[in-house]
Regions:
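Noncatalytic alpha-helical scaffolds and linker/capping helices
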Residues: 10, 138-139
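Short helix-loop capping/hinge motifs at secondary-structure junctions, enriched
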Residues: 1-9, 102, 214-215
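Short helix-initiation/N-cap motifs at beta->coil->alpha
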Residues: 147-157
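Short glycine-rich hinge loops at helix-strand junctions in the catalytic core
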Residues: 142
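Short, well-ordered beta-strand elements
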Residues: 114-124, 145-148
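Hydrophobic alpha-helical membrane-insertion segments
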Residues: 77-87
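Immediate post-signal peptide segment of exported/extracytoplasmic ligand-binding proteins
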Residues: 7, 89-119
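Detector for C-terminal structural segments
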Residues: 14-76, 90-93, 126-136, 158-285
Length: 285
């Protein structure tokens, strides 16, 4: 949609989702904010661009935001635990103004007098408690925002036909990314039903996907994906949500396991074993 073409608009909308309030009020403080498309992995971009990433991204400069080369990688700002973070609201209003929208009579309007509106489409009642406060914050910004909940069949049909503005979804990426990146981020899949939900079309991203698919070493792949992560985050195509960086498991304490477990796998069915001594201690209590 044309109204979301300016990345300033997309960034401003994202500023109005208060993760810290949601985490404290709704999630018992159990989660961390997602900041990366490859969160908590060796492929997550961090800080300022490295010399290795610069070598990859320099030839693509004309396709990507200048901020990639001048600023640290984008991380959503931390909000105060109050429902509305006034600092982020002021920043969001400034971004809208820079994109040609001004506050008039409590509404964000362009030079034609059109009011900025948006709809968040949802099919799960479980997400009402998350979406509704976000809607309220967007209204405080001067946006005519609404939350529409429909059944899953209608939802699937509307998503496939691109009849939506904002939805809730996940970007589940592989730890060994390759040709499947075309389905999620390539211009080739922007106009057809695919995992490229936002219809992303960027020649620089397309080139990075091709580089990743043809990487020959793990080190090379990691550098390319860090470059891709940095680039995607600069485009503000999402409002990052949350994740849990640890496994939470309840178990009877008669098992043992290796000191060093795989980084992303609990290994309960692969590496744990029944410990007779622990079982005897437990049974004697």
């Amino acid at each position: 949609l044309d109204k979301f073409n300016d990345p300033k608009i997309r960034e401003a909308i994202g500023l109005m989702f208060n993760f810290e309030w949601s985490n404290k009020t709704l999630f018992f403080g159990l989660y961390d904010r997602v900041t990366s498309f490859w969160e908590n992995s060796a492929m997550q971009a961090s800080g300022r661009i490295s010399k290795e990433e610069l070598a990859i991204l320099n030839p693509l400069k004309k396709y990507l935001p200048e901020s990639i080369f001048s600023d640290p990688v984008f991380i959503p700002p931390t909000s105060k635990p109050d429902k509305v973070d006034r600092k982020n609201r002021r920043k969001a209003i400034k971004l809208f103004q820079d994109a040609g929208w001004d506050l008039a009579d409590g509404k964000l309007k362009n030079k034609k007098g059109d009011i900025f509106s948006l709809e968040i489409l949802n099919y799960s009642p479980a997400f009402d408690r998350i979406i509704n406060p976000f809607i309220e914050n967007l209204k405080l910004l001067g946006i005519e925002a609404k939350h529409t909940r429909i059944d899953s069949t209608q939802y699937t049909e509307r998503v496939r036909n691109f009849e939506w503005e904002i939805i809730t979804s996940t970007y589940g990426n592989s730890l060994t990314p390759g040709i499947e990146l075309v389905q999620q981020y390539s211009s080739k899949t922007a106009d057809v039903p695919s995992r490229n939900l936002v219809g992303l079309k960027n020649e620089g991203i397309d080139i990075l996907i091709n580089l990743a698919a043809n990487a020959t070493t793990r080190k090379e792949l990691n550098e390319i994906i860090r470059s891709l992560d940095r680039s995607l985050r600069s485009l503000h195509i999402w409002v990052p949500q949350w994740y849990k960086k640890v496994h939470t498991v309840a178990y009877r304490d008669h098992y043992s396991y290796p000191k060093n477990l795989p980084p992303f796998d609990l290994g309960a069915f692969d590496f744990w074993w029944f410990d007779k001594e622990k079982a005897e201690i437990l049974n004697n209590k």
